[in-house]
Amino acid sequence: MAYGSKHPYGEIETETTIKNISSDMCRQFYKDYFIPNNSYLIIVGDVNPTVEKQRAAKYFGAWKSGTKLTHTPPAVDMNSKTTLDFVNKSGAVQSVISLTYPVNLKPNDSDKLKARVMNTMFGGFFRSRLNDNLREKHGYTYGVRSSLSDDRFVGRFSAGGSVRNEVTDSSIIEMFKEINRMKTELITDEEYHSVRNVMAGDFGRSLESPQTVANFALNIARFDLPTDYYNNYVQNLMAVSKQDILNMANKYLKPENAHIVVVGNKDIASKLAAFSHDKKVHFYDVYGKPIEMNTETPSLSASQVIDKYVQAIGGIDKVKSVTSVATNMEASLQGMVISMTEKKKIGGKYLQTVSLMGNTLQKQVCDGTKASSSVQGQPQTLTEADIQELKNNSDFCPQLYYSSKGHKLEVKGIEDIEGKKAYQLDITPKVGQKWTEYYDLASGLIIREVKVDGEGENMATMTSDLSDYKEVKGLLVPHKTVISGTMPMPLEAIVKSVKINEEIPDSEFKID
């Protein structure tokens, strides 16, 4: 959004773009750019310069120079008016806000340090104005930050954080208020002393790392900084005035050029249109490509969606005949095999174990009345909602009993899920968190489930994509589940076996 799709910084890494890179291209890149006249050797420590130069000549002396290639990317087109860009994340209970735009700030610009002080005061540390407003004063978020980055081609300003759905619009309003304050008011004496002292302290602590010292030397060489730039850093920092900070705010805080990017539940999108210059919400997919949201009106009610699903997986008689199910699945995580076993039995009995290379990571069990959970052998506290969820999981087809258990059901609309149109069904239980299921319009099968995992600052949205339905004793069962949102990368779980109506002794569900 900030740089545009034609600028290298605006490129998004996808499976397709990665596949476009061949081994020959990597070899050519290495040949073109890994040359001594395009390299720096930096040594930090208690060393003898003469000895280290001799050692460098010994090991790198035969390295042949090459033609140093230079590329200048196209200029970034500054957004001329504020726009509201929205990326739908189904089922999300929080919105991620990023107010962002490119800035012309080079590493060797004379006002770089002044600009950094301004940004730190605005949103660069815990006691910043932005955090004080949205976290401390209003309680909208657990933390909000801003950053102002320099770059030899084009820098970037960004401000935002995660906020509750219902205060997304209010959070954006408060962000604009704080920007206006920075541009129209001198900071207070207390703020002035605090921000400079914090930055001076951070700088001093950073010198404890040899990597930081090496990076300072590299910056001086690469960006033609004064040789005493870092020696005089604290002195120059303390010389930044209140007026300097006000001037920098007016130079670099440009909300009129901003993309307000919001990732969250589309149910809140219409409330945000007022922030866009054209009073429209511009929708994008996760790769930053413009899309049109589906506006079709659902033709089925919630009960009809579930009836169609039950019929699709085998019919109500087949579904009700199920008394037990045992499923074994496997997934791979960084070359290690994760085994997942799930057993269900009528009477609210449920067992799930997750093992990594033979060692049990997690175990959940419900005997129909009581329930327990452990992670790596350590007992976990279960809420009433957790226990009820485990009981619900014991059903082969829990959808059949949603209404009888008092769940509130609502078809919210039609979504495009991985190229398929699907009904969005929101389920609100009597106890616990709401979740969402997506049913393929064509087949009637569930193709996605979205649930909220965790609480407070640790809350995350877990998405499970279901596919590869196969028949087992006359019933369709998904044999592939891709789980995303609760870990750095998606986890693909494949069903290895499904046993329906085979004896599972009650002792399997015994709670220790």
Which stretches of residues belong to each language-model region?
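Gly/Pro-enriched, hydrophobic low-complexity segments
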Residues: 49, 355-357, 421-511
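M16 family metallopeptidases and their MPP-like homologs
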Residues: 1-16, 38-44, 94-106, 110, ...
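C-terminal soluble interaction/assembly domains
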Residues: 239, 243-251, 256, 262-265, ...
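An aromatic/glycine/proline-enriched structural segment found at the starts
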Residues: 40-105, 264, 273-294
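N-terminal mature ectodomain segment of secretory-pathway/periplasmic proteins
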Residues: 304-378, 406-416
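Buried hydrophobic packing residues in well-ordered domains
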Residues: 26-29, 41-43, 56, 99, ...
